[in-house]
Amino acid sequence: MKHSVTVVQDEKENFGTVVKGFVIKLMPAMPKWNGKNLVRKVLIPLASIVLFIGLWHVGAKALYNIEADYKIQKALTDQGQEAADQMAECIASGAISCQPNTLPSPAQVWTSFNTLIADHKAISADKAEFKAKTATLNVKREAEGKAPITYTGRPSFVDQIFTSLKTVFAGFLLALIIAVPVGVIIGLSTTLRSSFNWLIQIFKPVSPVVWLLLVFMIVKTMTKNSDSDSAFIISFISVGLCSMWATLVNTAMGVATVDKDYINVAKVLKLGPIQKVFKVILPSSLPLIFTGLRITLSVAWMVLIAIELLAQSPGLGSFVWEEFQNGAIDSNSKIIVAMFVIGIIGFLLDRIMLTVQSMVSFNKNATA
């Protein structure tokens, strides 16, 4: 009995050690906060943020004044002094109808951000109310074999963010499934590398718009009598085809440049072809493969906006285009909010990939 208790305690200690090691890998070590680190890691970044916001505010104010002067001068030229005076008074009063529509200030962008969050909360409340009202009816419809009644209201800004994330992850997964196996096969053979190099070099620089049109033609034909979401399918396939090339090239290069000593060790151990790939070649190629995957994810996120805009998928691309078309006084500030959200999410996705790379790869210098 005492022996079994000791074994359980040992297992708990081993599990705790594994979890602790995982957390240490996932979270970077905290720096020692001496004066030099405090200045370099905190004060200088904060100063750069303050400087950026200050320059932005000054630039927005200057553009506002230029646009306001233009509107006043135009009123003077077209309608006379009285109209110009009225325009000047209207602009000074802050009335929405006559405000210059130019680069928004940081304060306006922050206000629009809060407006979008409040709008999301209101839409979420409407969804919850709709779900509660239709719950009984949907249970009855499902029992009768009918499709449930779903909420068809407009998506909120936060909903569109999650739609874009779903699309980019589906596209990234497609790129991974295609690029890594094909890259391994091409990398194992000099003949295949020479045979497929021209194909890669031709398709790698193709514009996302062209890929979208090609995918659109194929998907529309194949989903004519289907209830599937063709906009989502078109978007994620286009994203995957646009972004897979960096992973394909890096995987082939990583496989082709595996140290010959590792290959010789595999021969000595008499590993079969499959064992050699999974136990020697792929582990040795991981640094280059993950570099390609990081580039693929970044490219996927960049091309997503243009693809969603054209495919009419209800994501961030659609949000930006609708606000641009809307032309309301706060449309520009909402577009700037979307720009910051896109940039921050792109940065976080890259950090996640870098963290995963450091956990599964022996290359500890990949910290760019």
Functional labels for PLM-detected ranges:
Residues 30, 65-172:
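Periplasmic/extracellular loop-to-transmembrane helix junction in inner-membrane transport proteins
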Residues 336-368:
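C-terminal transmembrane helix and the adjacent membrane-cytosol boundary/short C-terminal tail
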Residues 170-200:
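Transmembrane-helix boundary motif in ABC transporter permease subunits
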Residues 273-307, 337:
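Transmembrane alpha-helices
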Residues 187, 197, 201-244, 254:
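Generic hydrophobic transmembrane alpha-helix motif, especially the helices
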Residues 30-69:
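N-terminal signal-anchor/first transmembrane alpha helix
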Residues 158-170, 193, 200-203, 286, ...:
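Alpha-helical membrane-interface segments at transmembrane helix boundaries
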Residues 246, 250-289:
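Short cytoplasmic-facing helical segments at TM-TM junctions of multi-pass membrane proteins
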